[in-house]
């Protein structure tokens, strides 16, 4: 009689498809961190530390947004708190960008506001390229993310049409 024991492995090995897709980084520009550029690596382990009210939970709340969660469902509106757009994208120059892999290629999706509405645009470049010094100097001149994307960035990279529906965005990002 032989002893047959199940083999248990604690090591997680992502599939080839998983290695070829997924969230890489989150970029915040003039968002809830006033007039700052913030880059957060989402690969491997990340340690977010800070005092109470520093924005750690607000940052973590952005991850479900990338995967298609309704933005206003992420922000608590109790006690007169701001909407998603008012909190995360307070000015026309504010933006959130998610850098991700799609079929092995680095791409970005940029969230921005215009007239209190949230919009999404896909850009066929890496975050490093999108936020290059030259591109950010141009953004400072435009001082409007919507115009910067369609009038400047679109000259060098494919920029999608503006999406105003989270459902449309979710369909694309989850496909």
Outline where the language-model segments fall:
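Electropositive, glycine-dotted interaction segments
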Residues: 112-175
């Amino acid at each position: 009689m032989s002893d047959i024991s199940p083999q248990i492995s604690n090591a997680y090995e992502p599939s080839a498809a998983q290695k070829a897709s997924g969230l890489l980084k989150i970029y915040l520009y003039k968002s809830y961190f006033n007039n700052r550029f913030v880059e957060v690596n989402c690969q491997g382990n990340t340690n977010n530390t800070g005092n109470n009210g520093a924005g750690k939970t607000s940052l973590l709340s952005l991850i479900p947004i990338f995967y298609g969660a309704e933005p206003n469902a992420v922000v608590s509106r109790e006690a007169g708190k701001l909407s998603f757009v008012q909190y995360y994208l307070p000015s026309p120059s504010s933006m959130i960008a998610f850098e991700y892999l799609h079929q092995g290629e680095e791409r970005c999706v940029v969230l921005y506001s215009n007239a209190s509405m949230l919009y999404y645009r896909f850009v066929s470049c890496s975050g490093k390229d999108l936020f290059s010094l030259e591109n950010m100097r141009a953004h400072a001149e435009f001082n409007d993310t919507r115009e910067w994307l369609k009038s400047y960035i679109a000259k060098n990279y494919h920029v999608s049409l503006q999406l105003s529906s989270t459902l449309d965005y979710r369909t694309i990002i989850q496909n």
